[in-house]
Amino acid sequence: MPHNKHTVYAITDATLMPTTASLCHRVELALRSGVTWLQYRDKSSNTSKRSEQAQALKALCQTYNAKLIINDDTALAKQVGADGVHLGQTDGCIVSARELLGPQAIIGSTCHASLELAERALAQGSSYVAFGRFFASNTKPNAAPAQLSLLAHAQQKFTCPIVAIGGITPSNGAQLLHAGATTLAVCHSLFADDNVEYRAKCLLGLTPNAEDALVTS
């Protein structure tokens, strides 16, 4: 994730895109608009479906020169040749994921609102740390809130990419960039809207020194 310009990190949602066709269609719209990081997130137990979809997304990401990260499944990331895996606090061991995926793999860690969790994750080999939720979230409505000041502290403390997640829209994303986030992770705001391309471009066009984009959330 580059530090000179923020990254939009798109996260899929199996409820919003229940079929492989709908998933690939909306993801391709986002990638075509300039999104370069994608996380495949499907918590279902349907392993054949998840394998099929992950392989399809890997092909799309290769076409658009984007990174594919698998949520919570190191084995699936290895199987499809994904660029890495994202692990929650109860999703698996960072050290084991690094051993399986290799030194070049991207490993992300959910750290909620805790600098201590982030410090521990980085010590274990995480590539980036994710904080949030910062706003009301449709994907995880019961997640504990995080304060904007957390991002400034993280930016001062860590040199890795700082990912903000939770309720991010084109109308509030600039606040997070100004506070210290390098990466905006978005799910519902991007993929629940019919005009995925427009939403992606609005998110990509945010700047930390500008007023929030004047678009509806």
Curated annotation (Swiss-Prot):
One of its GO terms (molecular function) is magnesium ion binding. It comes from the Bacteria. InterPro entries: Aldolase_TIM, ThiamineP_synth_sf, ThiamineP_synth_TenI, TMP_synthase. Its EC number is 2.5.1.3. 4-amino-2-methyl-5-(diphosphooxymethyl)pyrimidine binds at Q39, Y40, R41, D42, K43, N71, T110, K140. Its cofactor is Mg(2+). Pathway: Cofactor biosynthesis; thiamine diphosphate biosynthesis; thiamine phosphate from 4-amino-2-methyl-5-diphosphomethylpyrimidine and 4-methyl-5-(2-phosphoethyl)-thiazole: step 1/1. 2-[(2R,5Z)-2-carboxy-4-methylthiazol-5(2H)-ylidene]ethyl phosphate binds at S137, N138, T139, G167. Keywords: Magnesium, Metal-binding, Thiamine biosynthesis, Transferase. Mg(2+) binds at D72, D91. One of its GO terms (cellular component) is cytoplasm. Condenses 4-methyl-5-(beta-hydroxyethyl)thiazole monophosphate (THZ-P) and 2-methyl-4-amino-5-hydroxymethyl pyrimidine pyrophosphate (HMP-PP) to form thiamine monophosphate (TMP). Belongs to the thiamine-phosphate synthase family. NCBIfam families: thiE. This is Thiamine-phosphate synthase. The gene is thiE.
